[in-house]
């Protein structure tokens, strides 16, 4: 028989008491009252913050948006098919974040940073809040460096600077995305990190864009954030903020970044859907009252930082789709008032064969002229005016039968300028080529060339400069100026190419 000694028992109990550590865990828990249409109403969650992430029993994450007296309205970031009435919900104590780092470059991610390209996990170095405050006035510098798009019509007449917000607006199928993609392609070798945010687009369209970027080597400096049409409205609403957070990571490291939001109309529609389901009062066009703030807080994050903060920049190119050219609708007017200018694409011009279909009359850049390179500023001053006058005269000439010689000359010049600015997709021009093309048109050096030969003249001139006058390209590209020596070289090249074109006609 084993004898039990009381002192042994007491020492064991004492030992266990010493080892016991009281770990009190307080959790903020609620109960699902109702779920459906991507919205959950939750009872409890007394301590929840606005915008805080909440976790449901089945692992689905949501964001608490409506904090009411007796319940919390949360939007789901997944299907949420297994969430049941009466199941528990936990508050996480975190606001939505995205993992960021250099490893994101070249990848396709969801608005929450999950990889979508099948290339494995992303080794992120830190997390950034998806919504973060915009830089203040002291933290900024005025826009003074050019962001070349490679599209002659834009760089000559509607120049964009680093840190600017320039809206691309137009009807569907007018080439809005094409301009954005061309701008990304033109950043090759410029040490600019590009972020392309696809909101509510077809997965096939996004796949095509990624393929174009990969083929032309642009994916090496681009991050794609995709919230496709099949994704919940919550992810489509978050996608632009996630793109801005990724760009901010690089901007605060002193890099130049370019963000394209394609397009913010779909984000506004996703937000309207969420707001109506949350029973928020509808306003104009059934959008909620804070839809202006939705876009302003996003676009204000674009900035050119002061030298004290590293001098990085974030240039934003938001895209807005209009209905039948109506720029006075609610969302277009909101975004026009927030941005520093707009590039308006017209379906009439597009259908008439002018690509890119930029309506020069109502397109404007409010701050970009300060950033325009001297070479193109020197020669493109009159270009916008001449094209605007040509549009007026062309409308008038339809009714007038006999026109005086000066008017005929002006119409002829305008037609040739129009042809000069035509540019095929995915073929951005370098600065020296743009200078050459605009110079030839503005100085009247192609007035004798037939209109149908102008496109041939442009391609001939580009190849001639590359092969026979490389010193002109070198001079303009390095100094960003058109001095007398470079101008003399350019005149020779234009005369030579013109002679060849006229001889062949």
From Swiss-Prot:
Gene3D superfamilies: 2.40.30.20, ATP synthase alpha/beta chain, C-terminal domain (1.20.150.20), P-loop containing nucleotide triphosphate hydrolases (3.40.50.300). InterPro entries: ATP_synth_asu-like_sf, ATP_synth_asu_C, ATP_synth_asu_C_sf, ATP_synth_F1_a_nt-bd_dom, ATP_synth_F1_asu, ATPase_a/bsu_AS, ATPase_F1/V1/A1_a/bsu_N, ATPase_F1/V1/A1_a/bsu_N_sf. It is found in: Cellular thylakoid membrane. SUPFAM superfamilies: C-terminal domain of alpha and beta subunits of F1 ATP synthase (SSF47917), N-terminal domain of alpha and beta subunits of F1 ATP synthase (SSF50615), P-loop containing nucleoside triphosphate hydrolases (SSF52540). It comes from the Bacteria. It catalyses: ATP + H2O + 4 H(+)(in) = ADP + phosphate + 5 H(+)(out). Keywords: ATP synthesis, ATP-binding, CF(1), Hydrogen ion transport, Ion transport, Membrane, Nucleotide-binding, Thylakoid, Translocase, Transport. The record marks 363 as: Required for activity. ATP binds at residues 170-177. Its EC number is 7.1.2.2. Pfam families: ATP-synt_ab, ATP-synt_ab_C, ATP-synt_ab_N. Coiled coil: none annotated. Its main location: membrane. PANTHER family: ATP SYNTHASE SUBUNIT ALPHA, MITOCHONDRIAL. Produces ATP from ADP in the presence of a proton gradient across the membrane. The alpha chain is a regulatory subunit. Belongs to the ATPase alpha/beta chains family. HAMAP family: ATP_synth_alpha_bact. F-type ATPases have 2 components, CF(1) - the catalytic core - and CF(0) - the membrane proton channel. CF(1) has five subunits: alpha(3), beta(3), gamma(1), delta(1), epsilon(1). CF(0) has four main subunits: a(1), b(1), b'(1) and c(9-12). This is ATP synthase subunit alpha. It comes from Synechococcus sp. (strain ATCC 27144 / PCC 6301 / SAUG 1402/1).
């Amino acid at each position: 028989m084993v004898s039990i000694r009381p002192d042994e028992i007491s020492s064991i109990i004492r030992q266990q008491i010493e080892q016991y550590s009281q770990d009190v865990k307080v959790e903020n828990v609620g109960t699902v009252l109702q779920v459906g249409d991507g919205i959950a109403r939750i009872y409890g969650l007394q301590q929840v913050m606005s915008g805080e992430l909440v976790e449901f029993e089945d692992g689905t994450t949501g964001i608490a948006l409506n904090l009411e007296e007796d319940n919390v309205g949360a939007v789901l970031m997944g299907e949420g098919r297994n969430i049941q009435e009466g199941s528990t919900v936990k508050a996480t104590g975190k606001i939505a974040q995205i993992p960021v780092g250099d490893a994101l470059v070249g990848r396709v991610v969801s608005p929450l940073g999950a990889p979508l390209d099948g290339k494995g996990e992303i080794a992120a170095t830190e997390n950034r809040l998806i919504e973060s405050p915009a830089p203040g006035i002291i933290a900024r510098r005025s826009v003074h460096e050019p962001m070349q798009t490679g599209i002659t019509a834009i760089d000559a007449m509607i120049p964009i600077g680093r840190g600017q917000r320039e809206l691309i607006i137009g009807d569907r199928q007018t080439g809005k995305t094409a301009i954005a993609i061309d701008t990304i392609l033109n950043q090759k070798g410029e040490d600019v990190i590009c972020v392309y945010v696809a909101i509510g687009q077809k997965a096939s369209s996004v796949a095509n864009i990624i393929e174009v970027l990969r083929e032309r080597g642009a994916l090496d400096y681009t991050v794609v954030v995709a919230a496709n049409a099949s994704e919940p409205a919550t992810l489509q609403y978050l996608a632009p903020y996630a793109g801005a957070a990724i760009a901010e990571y690089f901007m605060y490291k002193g890099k130049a970044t370019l963000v394209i939001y394609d397009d913010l109309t779909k984000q506004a529609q996703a937000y309207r859907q969420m707001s109506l389901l949350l029973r928020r009062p509808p306003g104009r066009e059934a959008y909620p009252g804070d839809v202006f703030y939705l876009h302003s807080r996003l676009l204000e994050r674009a900035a050119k930082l002061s030298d004290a903060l590293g001098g990085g920049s974030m240039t934003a190119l938001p895209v807005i789709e209009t209905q039948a050219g109506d720029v006075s609708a609610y969302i277009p007017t909101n975004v026009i008032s927030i941005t520093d200018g707009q590039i308006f694409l017209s379906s009439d011009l597009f259908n008439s064969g002018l690509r890119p279909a930029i309506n020069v009359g109502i397109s404007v850049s409010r701050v970009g002229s300060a950033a325009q390179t001297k070479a193109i500023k020197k020669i493109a001053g009159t270009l916008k005016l001449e094209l605007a006058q040509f549009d007026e005269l062309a409308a008038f000439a339809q009714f007038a039968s006999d026109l005086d010689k000066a008017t005929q000359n002006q119409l002829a010049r305008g037609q040739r300028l129009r042809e000069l600015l035509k540019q095929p997709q995915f073929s951005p021009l370098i600065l020296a080529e743009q200078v050459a093309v605009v110079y030839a048109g503005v100085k009247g050096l192609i007035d004798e060339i037939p209109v149908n030969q102008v496109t041939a003249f442009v391609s001939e001139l580009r190849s001639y400069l590359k092969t026979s006058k490389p010193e002109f390209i070198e001079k303009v590209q390095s100094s960003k100026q058109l001095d007398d020596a470079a101008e003399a070289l350019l005149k020779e090249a234009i005369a030579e190419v013109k002679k060849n074109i006229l001889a062949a006609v």
